[in-house]
UniProtKB/Swiss-Prot annotation:
Pfam families: TruB_N. Signal peptide: none annotated. Residues 26-35 have a biased composition (Polar residues). This is Trans-splicing factor Raa2, chloroplastic. It comes from Chlamydomonas reinhardtii (Chlamydomonas smithii). Changing residue 142 to I/R: No loss of function. InterPro entries: PsdUridine_synth_cat_dom_sf, PsdUridine_synth_N, tRNA_PsdUridine_synth_B_fam. It is found in: Plastid, Chloroplast. One of its GO terms (cellular component) is chloroplast. One of its GO terms (molecular function) is pseudouridine synthase activity.
């Protein structure tokens, strides 16, 4: 047995392309198919320190950490030419079994990362099968005063799915389109975040609030004058925001790489107050957050504003301030004309439509619009109508969806 093994290796050594050198033959035997126990050479990225003043050096110094490379650079310091840090592929030795394990892990990660187009759930009970719930998307029309976790929990209980997530969150007081992803479709979150989203709603011009919303306790309906603004002023201010986001050299614009817009994004500061909803209630309160100087990039593709005909008394918190004046008018006048004027003029209510890319900062956009008009502005009502190519008209109303899911899912 030893003779055959010796003859075999001797024959391989004699016919090796490396010649009769012992070190070359040994290196050739390490890479032979029959010697799997020997380590194999592979290439890794390391930090290489080169000294241009010493070109006669045999090999550059190599380090795997930045700190060690800097220490070696100080040792190689030269007055004429400073050392340079550059990445370089170097050889290392790992076993073939470890190489196979690494290849299998890379292949498994590639297979898991390959996103299969999910099924849009449109009919019941056909789209409630396990294979659909493992990779599906459900369009939901969220009513106001519903938290996103409440919507996700209600749908998950009704369908019995293992994994449900909302890839496009929405404020509790806002209504409109939500995307609920089942199973592996939750990998769509980065793509949905980069998609364009359209919002519609109303804003109160002249009113101010710490949170930028009329539901906050600090809201004042007519803090600054806004009745003198004409329709032309409103259109020019809205078009000015779109022009600034489209590439005009204005203060506060930074470059971004989105393909859908003009290539620039408005940079805004986050608010130090946010609006929170009381548990199991439709009331809200303002909560102070830690101030931050981190700016938020907001890409604006379209922004249109038009005047509302009149402000109803039951529409939001802006009209609630005038209910007491109307009641006092009926008690005193008994049908006669009340000569007293309210303590503040009525705020200007406008309708708007905005198309944003990335994470939505509608309150910051409304506040920025008010500053361009030399007044204040607060968000009154908000509804999301589009996410990419999805429209709210194709979504299921939540009040009608949950009973249907409970009836067909189990």
């Amino acid at each position: 047995m030893r003779t055959r093994a010796g003859a075999f290796f001797g024959k391989q050594r004699s016919t090796s392309p490396s010649g009769s050198s012992t070190s070359a033959s040994r290196q050739w035997l390490r890479s032979s198919p029959g010697r799997t126990q020997r380590p194999a050479a592979h290439r890794v990225l390391a930090v290489c320190v080169r000294n241009p003043a010493r070109p006669a050096a045999d090999h550059p110094l190599v380090s795997t950490t930045q700190a060690a490379a800097q220490r070696q650079a100080r040792q190689w310091d030269s007055r004429s030419k400073p050392p340079q840090l550059q990445p370089q592929l170097r050889h290392t030795h790992v076993s073939r079994q470890a190489q196979r394990r690494q290849q299998q892990q890379v292949q498994q990660q590639a297979e898991a990362g390959a996103l299969v187009v999910p099924t849009v759930i449109t009919s019941f009970p056909e789209h409630l099968r396990p294979e659909v719930l493992a990779n599906g998307v459900l369009l939901v029309d969220k009513p106001p005063h519903w938290e996103v976790p409440e919507v996700v929990a209600a749908v998950q209980r009704a369908t019995g799915a293992d994994k449900v997530a909302s890839v496009a969150p929405l404020d509790a007081r806002a209504s409109g389109l939500m995307l609920l992803c089942f199973g592996s479709a939750t990998r769509l979150a980065p793509r949905v975040e980069r998609a364009a989203k359209r919002y519609t709603g109303t804003l109160v011009l002249g009113g101010s609030s710490l949170s930028g919303d009329v539901r906050g306790g600090s809201f004042r309906a007519a803090q600054l004058p806004a009745e003198h603004l004409t329709d032309e002023d409103l259109r020019e201010a809205a078009q000015g925001l779109v022009t600034a986001a489209a590439g005009a050299p204005v203060h506060g614009a930074v470059a971004t790489g989105h393909q859908g817009g003009g290539g620039l994004a408005l940079r805004v500061l986050p608010r130090t107050w946010r609006l929170r909803q009381l548990p199991s209630s439709t009331e809200y309160y303002e909560e102070r957050v830690e101030p931050s100087m981190r700016t938020l990039d907001m890409e604006l593709l379209d922004f249109r504003v038009w005047r509302e005909s009149a402000l109803s008394h039951n529409d939001g918190a802006a009209g609630a301030e005038y209910d007491q004046h109307d009641q006092h008018k009926q008690e005193l006048g008994r049908g006669l004309v009340w000569t007293r004027s309210p303590p503040h003029p009525r705020p200007v209510v406008l309708r708007f439509s905005a198309l944003l890319v990335g994470r939505s900062h509608v309150r910051s956009l409304i506040a920025m619009y008010g500053r361009r008009l030399r007044t204040a502005a607060c968000l009154d009502d908000l509804r999301r109508t589009e996410i990419g190519s999805f429209n709210v008209e194709e979504a299921w109303p939540l009040e009608a969806l949950v009973p249907v899911l409970q009836r067909h899912a189990h």
